[in-house]
Amino acid sequence: MNSRIMNIARARNGILEWIRVNKPDVDYFIMMDSNSYSCQGDIRPEILGKYLTDKYTKDWDSLSFARIPYYDLWAYSDNAIQLGCWTYPTRLMRYVRSGITAYTYQNVIEKHINNTIFNKKNEDESVAVDSAFCGFAIYKTKVFINHEYLGYLDPSLFDKNKLVQNLRRFPPLQPDGRPVNIQGKLVDCEHRAFHLAAKKYSNARIMVAKDQLFGPFQTT
């Protein structure tokens, strides 16, 4: 098990526990990454304020924000894209005639995001997904406070039909071509379990706003 991911999950769970003990009545809480590649550029408070008005808060329980380029592919799940990109190998052995690598799968995710979040023909200001973070997300406390972050893949949290679609269209293989056993507590992005559990048990609505909260910018 990847100790870095497990440590991050424990740290986020520690924040949740602090909220439970010290601020149980707050309406919202925020998770934010402060590393060099996530929340870059100046924050745009007018965007944050916009989505905290009654007009918008009625439509979401978790809200993250678009970014060009959209960097956080690992936390992203939607429709037939359920598994994290690093469930797939970075390379396959030469004798494996067909299969999907992490980079091929990332291309699939990017294309899907371009066709949904960045689709100019879609006039909606936010898009429903199964999991998304991209460095900054707001959560309704009453919906999320009793869920937890995991640093491993838990198949029981997925929508079964969507997971089956993922496995059929994009079957994960080991480098030697053998199937990946997704029941084996594989390392996974900690946000996915948090979001999927909230969707499954609390009917959470996970949304991505098309507006950029940081920037805007085209390159990073």
Residue ranges and their predicted role:
Residues 10, 14, 46-50, 193:
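Alpha-helical elements of Rossmann-like donor-binding domains used by nucleotide-donor carbohydrate transfer enzymes
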Residues 24-26, 57-61, 203-204:
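Short, high-confidence coil segments that cap the C-terminus of an alpha-helix
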Residues 1-27, 31-32:
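Active-site-proximal specificity loops/subdomain of glycosyltransferases
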Residues 142, 147-152, 170-188, 200-220:
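Active-site donor/metal-binding and catalytic loop motifs
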Residues 36-163, 171-173:
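Conserved catalytic core of nucleotide-sugar-dependent glycosyltransferases
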Residues 24-41, 213-214:
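Short, internal active-site loops enriched in acidic
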Residues 30-31, 62-65, 206-209:
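A structural signal for short, well-ordered beta-strand segments and their strand-loop junctions
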Residues 8, 132, 185-196:
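Conserved glycosyltransferase catalytic-site signature
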